[in-house]
Regions:
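N-terminal beta-alpha supersecondary unit
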Residues: 1-69
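Surface "functional belts" at beta-alpha junctions
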Residues: 22-39, 94-188
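Short, conserved micro-motifs enriched in small and acidic residues
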Residues: 38-42, 74-78, 188-189
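Active-site phosphate/pyrophosphate- and oxyanion-stabilizing loops and adjacent acidic/basic residues
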Residues: 49, 85, 102-103
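Phosphate-handling active-site elements
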Residues: 55-60, 88-98
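DPxDG-like acidic metal-binding loop motif
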Residues: 66-94
């Protein structure tokens, strides 16, 4: 099964093709892109075209479209979901929704993973993963309420995503580990 996937839930636009032979081709923006204004309407379709060309596939070879469904910014999600529906409808393909928090968590190699997306207004979208399995459903909360909302001691957890970059000091003061700013772990892939 060959899939085209993309995510526009944060400021960074990411896209990929997963070919039926298991080989993946990604358009992963630089992590610094998370601190810039979003450009999804300009970046998404060229990114999809780029990964499809590098993968050597056309729409006739694709079996489905996967799209990040957040949580995230309203406009970003609207661009991503509308693009997925439009492309899939034109090619008569199914659309597969993917949690953006789960996609972030997939890159975490730690017992406790805390994917965080900046929800603005001093809050984060979060979920908690233990050894890759989601153990706390997605929620929104200010960073100082994460332990209370998850019902867990978060010291030693690894936090990724643009929310972890924005609230690094608060998280690290609570014993949460945050990869360096330039890490690709912070980009939804």
């Amino acid at each position: 099964m060959t899939l085209v996937g993309f995510d526009t839930s944060t400021a960074a636009t990411s896209a990929c093709v997963l070919r039926g032979d298991g080989e993946a081709f990604e358009h992963v923006p630089a992590p610094g892109r998370l601190k810039e204004p979003p450009g999804h309407s300009r970046e998404l379709l060229p990114a999809v075209a780029d990964v499809m060309e590098r993968a050597g596939v056309g729409w006739a070879d694709v079996d489905g479209v996967a799209v990040g469904v957040g949580p995230g910014t309203f406009t970003g999600l609207r661009i991503g979901v509308a693009s997925a529906r439009g492309l899939a409808t034109a090619a008569r393909l199914p659309v597969y929704p993917v949690s953006s928090l789960a996609a972030l968590a997939a890159g975490i190699d730690a017992a406790l993973g805390l994917p965080l997306i900046d929800a603005r207004r001093g809050e984060l979208f979060a979920a908690l993963f233990e050894r890759g399995e989601q153990v706390v459903e997605p929620f929104a909360a200010p960073p100082h309420k994460l332990a209370e909302r998850t019902g867990r001691q978060l010291a030693g957890a690894v936090a990724v995503g643009d929310g972890s970059l924005r609230f690094r000091q608060i998280l690290e003061a609570a014993g949460v580990r945050v990869p360096p700013d330039g890490s690709e772990l912070h980009v939804v892939r």
